[in-house]
């Protein structure tokens, strides 16, 4: 079977090659000529699978190592007998890890305890669900807002956004970008919402889609003191981000929240599982697909006099590292994404020197203890 894979999809080499004829191409080398005889494509979101690319080719399955699938023309695929599969939830833990580590940084800077804060999670899909799990393990109180799920499931445990504004110290957004009513999310973080935050002054986090937030409204909100802190990973108009907003954000990163090595491995694995599902092609070495171990896999809590859970989390990922890089060179936003050294998730780290209570919390967040 002929497969063409994007060269930036990791961990495929040595697993696919023994059982299929696979070619690795950089995304800008994908063309009707280079993929003409491929039955399967393995791509990321940078490769646009449009009629201009697919017409006249032998492609019958497109797999993407990403949760998102806006880069695939689904209508064209359906009308031309081309199946497609995405990788839902592949980086959900990575995004939740990002949020928790950002909150740890803010807690250390401001001197508050996260256990005293109420977190509001807007959008409770794969990512929101993982964030709920980690926050619960940590011992945080949380409220959930997901209007489409509330409507579909008739579940009154989901609250309206206005209730989160009234009760939450932290509001983290994990919604898709949609323009269609009744649950449009475009500029959901807009002037009206931000003005309503003025009394409670929450920490606001956007780690979903840039255009979920109105850039100019965010700038006004920070300047007006409506927010305690602002964390931004996703930006309107990226890679050409607004420099005024960059200056005002407390933590600013170049859309890397989901970029863990584990998330990349999950995406690659799910692509190969889709090929097996559709064509029956088995990959005997699939069990070996795994990211490399972290450079420093042992976390010794005895080295830290206080804030030990926060220090353990920040050992896995410190958002101030990409924050400093972005502030130093905002014009290289895309280059920083491409060169980003993908961190490992918590399950790759062993914690020693923990108390019984700390060990229970850390195990709940996937650490080995």
From Swiss-Prot:
PROSITE patterns: D_2_HYDROXYACID_DH_1. Coiled coil: none annotated. Its main location: cytoplasm. Pathway: Cofactor biosynthesis; pyridoxine 5'-phosphate biosynthesis; pyridoxine 5'-phosphate from D-erythrose 4-phosphate: step 2/5. GO terms for biological process: pyridoxine biosynthetic process. It catalyses: 4-phospho-D-erythronate + NAD(+) = (R)-3-hydroxy-2-oxo-4-phosphooxybutanoate + NADH + H(+). The active site is at residues 209, 238, 255. Its EC number is 1.1.1.290. The keyword Lipid metabolism does not apply. Keywords: Cytoplasm, NAD, Oxidoreductase, Pyridoxine biosynthesis. GO terms for molecular function: 4-phosphoerythronate dehydrogenase activity; NAD binding. Substrate binds at residues 45, 66. GO terms for cellular component: cytoplasm. NAD(+) binds at residues 146, 233, 258. Belongs to the D-isomer specific 2-hydroxyacid dehydrogenase family. PdxB subfamily. NCBIfam families: PRK00257.1 (NF001309). Homodimer. Catalyzes the oxidation of erythronate-4-phosphate to 3-hydroxy-2-oxo-4-phosphonooxybutanoate. This is Erythronate-4-phosphate dehydrogenase. It comes from Porphyromonas gingivalis (strain ATCC BAA-308 / W83).
């Amino acid at each position: 079977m002929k497969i063409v894979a994007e060269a930036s999809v990791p961990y495929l080499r040595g697993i696919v090659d023994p059982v299929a004829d696979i070619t690795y191409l950089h995304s800008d080398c994908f063309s009707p000529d280079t993929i003409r005889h491929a039955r399967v494509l393995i791509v990321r979101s940078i490769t646009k699978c449009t009629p201009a690319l697919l017409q006249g080719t032998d492609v019958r399955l497109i797999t993407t190592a990403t949760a998102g699938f806006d880069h695939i023309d689904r209508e064209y695929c359906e009308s031309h007998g081309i199946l497609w599969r995405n990788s839902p939830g592949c980086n959900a833990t990575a995004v939740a890890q990002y949020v928790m580590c950002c909150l740890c940084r803010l807690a250390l800077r401001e001197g508050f305890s996260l256990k005293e804060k109420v977190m509001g999670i807007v959008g409770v899909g794969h990512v929101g669900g993982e964030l709920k799990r980690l926050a619960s393990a940590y011992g945080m109180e949380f409220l959930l807002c997901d209007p489409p799920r509330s409507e579909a499931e008739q579940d009154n445990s989901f609250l309206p956004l206005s209730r989160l504004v009234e009760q939450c110290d932290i509001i983290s957004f994990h919604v898709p970008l949609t323009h269609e009513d009744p649950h449009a999310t475009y500029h959901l973080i807009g002037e009206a919402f931000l003005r309503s935050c003025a009394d409670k002054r929450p920490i606001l986090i956007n780690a979903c889609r840039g255009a979920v937030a109105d850039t100019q409204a965010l700038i006004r909100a920070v300047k007006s003191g409506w927010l305690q802190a602002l964390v931004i990973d996703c930006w309107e108009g990226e890679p050409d981000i607004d420099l005024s907003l960059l200056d005002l954000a407390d933590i600013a990163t170049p859309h890397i929240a989901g970029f863990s090595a584990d998330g990349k491995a999950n995406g690659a694995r799910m692509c190969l599982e889709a090929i097996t599902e559709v064509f029956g092609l088995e990959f005997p070495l699939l069990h070996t697909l795994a990211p490399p171990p972290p450079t420093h896999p042992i976390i010794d809590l005895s080295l830290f006099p206080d804030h030990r859970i926060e220090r353990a989390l920040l050992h896995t990922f410190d958002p101030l590292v990409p924050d400093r890089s972005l502030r130093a060179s905002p014009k290289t936003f895309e280059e920083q994404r491409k060169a980003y050294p993908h961190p490992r998730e918590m399950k790759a780290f062993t914690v020693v020197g923990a108390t019984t209570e700390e060990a229970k919390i850390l195990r709940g967040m996937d650490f080995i203890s």
